[in-house]
């Protein structure tokens, strides 16, 4: 237990808080979310992109499931700070799926691998581009800190970039398959909502299959989580 946790525990005991040890965990999770977001907002590690829109941690820091996306989306550019998928067609899609599965979204934590709007300037115009490996590696420390602080029971990896932080491969081949992060946290990769949207927009013949498989993968995660941890109320029905 570090110094901050010891200080919180001492305050909790003085206040006669029921179950002070769990109170420490609760307080640390709240502080961790605020601290991560404070650092993200002021981060200037990547000169090319650090002065634009930032993706911060969203959802409930006490939640059971960490949902990791890829990067700030084009529709989100221009805001000071955004939560992953907030205000986008991808967000509408994923929340529709979660609603159909009766998921209690109070049990979810949201963050991205890359916390900036990655772009390049061409003829004075800002154009979206894929994150560089160096940008992904720089931002990974936030994910490591979040896992240490929030202690999620499960992690969902939305897309290739999210999966490759922990396991090298291609989502099409790895989706729907469990693997372990840090030997104890079950993780599952699935398609990025952005990829599904792109396939639908170009009329890809397998786009409908991708969406169905995406829903199947999420259903698998949440059903197992509910069975293993019924007290968490991960599913509402």
Predicted regions, residues:
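A polyanion-binding, active-site-adjacent surface
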Residues: 2-237
């Amino acid at each position: 237990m570090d110094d901050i946790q010891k200080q919180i525990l001492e305050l909790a005991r003085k206040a006669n808080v029921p179950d002070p040890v769990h109170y420490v965990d609760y307080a640390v999770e709240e502080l961790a979310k605020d601290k991560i977001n404070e650092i993200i907002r002021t981060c200037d590690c990547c000169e090319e992109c650090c002065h634009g829109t930032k993706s911060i941690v969203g959802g409930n820091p006490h939640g059971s499931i960490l949902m990791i996306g890829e990067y700030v989306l084009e529709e989100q550019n221009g805001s000071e700070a955004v939560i992953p998928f907030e205000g986008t067609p991808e967000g509408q899609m994923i929340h529709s799926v979660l609603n159909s599965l009766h998921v209690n979204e109070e049990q979810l934590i949201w963050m991205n691998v890359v916390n900036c709007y990655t772009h390049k300037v061409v003829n004075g115009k800002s154009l979206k581009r894929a994150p560089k490996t160096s940008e992904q590696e720089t931002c990974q420390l936030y994910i490591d800190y979040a896992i240490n602080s929030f202690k999620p029971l499960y992690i969902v990896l939305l897309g290739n970039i999210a999966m490759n932080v922990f396991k090298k491969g291609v989502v099409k081949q790895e989706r729907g398959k469990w693997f372990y992060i840090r030997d104890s946290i079950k993780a599952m990769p699935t398609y990025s909502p952005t990829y599904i949207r792109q396939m639908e927009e170009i009329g890809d013949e397998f786009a409908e299959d991708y969406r169905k498989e995406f829903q199947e993968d999420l259903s698998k995660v949440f059903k197992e989580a509910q069975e293993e941890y019924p007290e968490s109320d991960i599913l509402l029905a």
